[in-house]
């Protein structure tokens, strides 16, 4: 399963990307996460269906210092060959 998600709310400046990388690594999920200029956090999640669903559920709360107001989830069709979960440059 491959999912592209965009998380809105108080999600920048609160450690959300590092929190998400840690949770993804715990669940053996690959992909990336980055801040968007719009103030959102964007991520690509690749892995087991159940584990990705669990991670998306965790993202609805986020780390204790965040306040998530919305998550947009889309299927991702393109190939992604990296077998790690990375924090990448802002967009």
Segments from the language model and where they lie:
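Intrinsically disordered, low-complexity, mixed-charge
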Residues: 1-91
